[in-house]
Amino acid sequence: RKVAQYFFLHSAQADDYVVEMNPGTVQAVAGSPYSLQVCDVPLTMASAVCEKSKQFKLSADYYKGDRSMRESGFDVSFRFGPFGAATHHYAPVCLNSLLYKTEKDLEQISLWLGHGEEAEKWKQRAEARRKLIARYLWNQEQGLFFDYNFQTSRLSTYRYASTFYPLWAGLATAEQAKAVVDNLKVFERPGGLPMSTEESGAQWDLPYGWGNIEMVAIDGLRRYGFNADADR
């Protein structure tokens, strides 16, 4: 209900997530129906004039994004649009950093086992991913890593603590790591690093922080030699 109410009040951000249930509606929907009635309430004692109540449902695309957002572990934030509804349209910094780290780990394991061919395969995959992350997820002007919306072909502008994942994974260049450190002030608060710089009212946005992400940031800073920043 809270999600539907938000989209009713912020129609510009609805992106077809709310569908009016008219005869012949063909757009895929799911979940329970919601009623909306708009009333003109006069300032006098006269009775309110109300439009006919309309039935709406949230679209199937909204629920696909919602389930993807919950699988991401970052539920709920506005990082991937309102209530994470567009999660399935993004290439996230955190997921790609984790995949890079996995590929590098598999390369090392293959070497330990004496599987040179297998090690080379994982090495090439990791390097290809590193280049794509640098190309699509790095914002040179802001000096931070951002998620990429592959549906709109646009880099997000939502500053999120996942920007520290490339440092933790060791895929950031020295210059990129220095730029992220220079922008620590964007995130830093008396209690540590919040999840984002946007106060949306959701669980994983400002002012809330998450211990796991604090450790990712600290380990990432140490990996690139920024021990003083990690210590504070």
Segment roles from a protein language model:
Residues 1, 92-107, 157-170, 208-223:
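Well-ordered alpha-helical segments within folded domains of soluble proteins
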Residues 1-4, 14-15, 110-127, 170-182, ...:
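Structural helix-adjacent loops and short alpha-helical linkers that scaffold large soluble proteins
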Residues 1-7, 98, 138, 204:
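Tryptophan-centric aromatic hotspots in well-structured domains and transmembrane helices
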Residues 6, 10, 102-109, 125, ...:
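Generic, well-ordered alpha-helical scaffold segments in large soluble proteins
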Residues 9, 14-17:
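Extended, charge-enriched helical/coil interaction regions that scaffold DNA-processing
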Residues 16-91, 128-209:
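Extended glycan-interaction surfaces of carbohydrate-active proteins
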Residues 74-132:
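C-terminal transactivation domains of fungal Zn(2)-Cys(6)
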Residues 86, 199-230:
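Amphipathic, soluble alpha/beta structural segments
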